[in-house]
């Protein structure tokens, strides 16, 4: 690879970089070798200041360059224990991100359209998150994104929150009244 490996995270990134093209049937079908190498170099440079969850998202970004729906980096129990999430889940239904699970106190928002997270429109959130989720099409992107869209760690990694512990502001259009609530 030509880059010096000086810590365990760099060793893992290098392993992924070397093995993905060997183990994937056609890794470079939609990504050039130059693009993959550039992403690898960027990941290697960032490891010094990277926590475990940022490292996880960095590995996801590298693996997603396969640009298919079956190549990904999974979560370990140790990582799951470090995740922070808001008490809601979202699904892409009827052409919009909607609240699919929420606490009883906010049941009136169930099925409501999520307009923005921390004032960032959902279309922009989706665009920012897209490089972290290997996918062949928008259906797969939205499916995989829905599994992590309630994670404040994801918001922090994408830059739509300053930290995972930051209070999250959701803008939701209530389904029954069309009123927007933040």
Which residues are covered by each model-predicted region?
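Flexible, low-complexity junctional segments that flank or bridge functional domains
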Residues: 1-182
């Amino acid at each position: 690879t030509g880059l010096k490996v000086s810590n365990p995270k760099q060793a893992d990134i290098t392993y992924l970089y070397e093995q993905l093209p060997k183990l994937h049937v056609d890794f470079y079908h939609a990504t050039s070798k130059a693009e993959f190498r550039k992403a690898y170099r960027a990941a290697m440079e960032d490891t010094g200041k990277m926590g475990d969850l940022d490292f996880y998202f960095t590995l996801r970004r590298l693996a997603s360059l396969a640009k298919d729906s079956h190549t990904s980096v999974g979560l370990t129990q140790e990582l799951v224990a470090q995740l922070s999430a808001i008490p809601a889940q979202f699904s892409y239904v009827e052409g919009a991100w909607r609240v699919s699970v929420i606490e009883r106190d906010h049941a009136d928002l169930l099925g409501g359209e999520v307009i923005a997270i921390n004032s960032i429109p959902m279309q922009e959130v989706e665009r920012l998150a897209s490089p972290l989720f290997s996918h062949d099409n928008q259906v797969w992107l939205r499916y995989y994104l829905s599994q992590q869209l309630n994670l404040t760690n994801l918001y922090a990694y994408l830059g739509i929150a300053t930290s995972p512990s930051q209070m999250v502001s959701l803008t939701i259009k209530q389904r029954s009244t069309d009123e927007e609530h933040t």
